[in-house]
Amino acid sequence: MNLVIVESPAKAKTINKYLGSDYTVLASYGHIRDLPSKNGSVDPENDFKMIWEVDSFSKKYLKEITDSAKDSKKIILATDPDREGEAIAWHVKEFLEEKKLLKDKEVERVVFNEITKKAVTNGIDNPRKIEPHLVDAYMARRALDYLVGFNISPILWTKLPGSKSAGRVQSVALRLLTEREQEIEVFQPKEFWTLNIIFKNNKNEKINTTISQLDGNKVEKFSFKNKQDINDALSKIKNKKYNITDISSKTYNRNPSGPFTTSTLQQTASSKLGFGASRTMQIAQRLYQGIDIEGETVGLITYMRTDGTNISKDAITSFRDFIMQNYGDKYLPEQPLNYSGKKAKNAQEAHEAIRPTEIIRNPEDMKK
């Protein structure tokens, strides 16, 4: 028997259908350990040594994992392919090692960018080790969260009783907001007016124009400081005769927007649908983990926490075939556009962009 550990029950349910009876898929329900809220959980004087503690919520799920691990030949850590997923895999492995349950057992780290049968099977066939740099990044972030929050929050509570705790990110964000508000408070507003002229041609079509010169002088932002300046300008231009002396046209090319990253997905969902970031990510999480389609649980999008804009070769081939079959070669570029343009600086950028797992599925079919 092989034990596969993921972080969520929805993901476990989907993967279990793909792998069959030789595998048991269990969920850790997120992180299983954390730094206890007490002094000394991170020791800066001792190479930032960190003390981890299993939280009460995770104990019952860890019992299920440990019981299954005892009877398993192989432990497969299949948590999400990002920093937090790598950290969960590391915590689970460390916990099982402390319980002396890994002796004579294989431990593999498996990742997949989408929850489809092909991707899961390919991930199982190509295991790797836990990535230490991602774990180090998680530890650095968690240590900073603790050190900032644990040391600053008590000071904050004495100054502002009943306030929330101070954090690594929100404390800096609050500073930026404060500085911006101070700039707004000292800002001295300055009045200015703009002047546009709307002409009509012999076909009664409107032509919108902007005044760029008046009496030989260039019109700038603050040329018209008040309504009197505008009235003076109007009296000069109303009775003049105007002619079109030259027409020039330019062709502008605009590339389509790049594939979605986490931030651009959230921005578009906000501007187009009015969704907040939390709602957007909840919906994306469901689409990633899978929904039931004709009795089968299928992941509809790739992993939704990514800074990368690259797309796999298989997906590009699928997209190009779809365009050719449905729209013709007129809409198919000779070469696929490259939006990354550089080597990924970190693991988040190395992930694929957010994309549909199967381009042939469309919203209308999903409604049926």
Name the predicted role of every residue range.
Residues 1-142, 148, 156, 224, ...:
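Intrinsically disordered, low-complexity regulatory segments
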Residues 18, 68-71, 91-95, 123, ...:
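Generic, well-ordered alpha-helical scaffold segments in large soluble proteins
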Residues 24, 33-54, 166-289, 328-330, ...:
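Long, highly charged, low-complexity internal segments
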Residues 70, 115-199, 246-253:
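C-terminal or mid-to-C-terminal helical accessory/interaction module adjacent to the motor/catalytic core
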Residues 97-105, 272-277, 290-297, 330:
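Secondary-structure transition/capping motifs at alpha-helix termini
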Residues 113-118, 262-263, 283-305:
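Short, conserved phosphate-binding/catalytic loop or strand-edge motifs used
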Residues 131-134, 147-149, 157, 232, ...:
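Extended, highly charged linker/hinge segments and catalytic-adjacent loops that couple domains
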Residues 133-139, 154-163, 187-194, 243-256, ...:
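Short coil/turn segments at secondary-structure boundaries
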